[in-house]
Amino acid sequence: MYAVIWMEVALDALADAFVQTDPPTRDLIERAVTRLNARLASDPSGLGESRPGHGRRIAFAQPCAIAFVVDEATGVVRVTHFWTY
């Protein structure tokens, strides 16, 4: 299992998206983030697509997307950005 750390900027973006939308979309965001967190903790290198830079990846779970960095040596995943689409 990996430790999943959401950087403050990503958490702020998640909170902003959550409060600025309607209840049905909030439910979608909550379920998407729950799925993403589960995959980040269990298999982050198999989630989403790689990006330039060591351990950098991007993943989508409608209606959300995240950018994250996997540090295999320490077993830590850092979510660096969050947005909705």
Q: Predicted regions: what is each one?
A:
Residues M1-A65, D71-Y85:
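Basic, Lys/Arg-enriched alpha-helical interface segments
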